[in-house]
């Protein structure tokens, strides 16, 4: 009886192990430059302001993924992230898209915004930078 149970267990273990590799879609997340038509110079405390950001999807296989948003005291670093299927042959895209950053200030004072625009030759990120006052 022990031999039968042992044989069944070994058979189940061997059948359940597979060497198949999932070659499903593989995705890449990239940051793309942000362009602002205008930036508000004042915000009201505890109210939500939408800041429209324009960006270009690099290929026809790319799609909006996320708004990168980092808070550091009064500085806000913002970037647009896109996702791309890296296993497809993709054509270059020139269509401009828009996404809005919903900003709600939490204190009265000056906020400093940094919107990502590129990485320079030395590998350092560069930004469009704006200051805005929060009153009342």
Indicate where each model-derived feature is located.
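First exposed extracellular module after export/assembly in secreted or surface-exposed proteins
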Residues: 26-136
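Bacterial Sec-dependent N-terminal signal peptides
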Residues: 2-35
């Amino acid at each position: 009886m022990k031999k039968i149970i042992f044989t069944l267990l070994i058979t189940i273990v061997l059948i359940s192990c597979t060497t198949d590799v999932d070659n499903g879609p593989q995705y890449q997340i990239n940051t793309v430059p942000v362009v602002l038509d205008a930036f508000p110079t004042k915000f009201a405390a505890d109210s939500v302001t939408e800041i429209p950001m324009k960006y270009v999807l690099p290929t026809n296989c790319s799609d909006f993924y996320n708004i990168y948003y980092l808070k550091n005291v009064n500085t806000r670093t913002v970037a647009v992230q896109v996702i791309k299927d890296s296993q497809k042959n993709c054509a270059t895209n020139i269509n401009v898209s828009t996404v809005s950053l919903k900003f709600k200030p939490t204190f009265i004072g000056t906020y400093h915004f940094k919107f990502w625009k590129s990485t320079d030759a030395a590998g350092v990120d560069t930004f469009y930078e704006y200051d805005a006052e929060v009153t009342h």
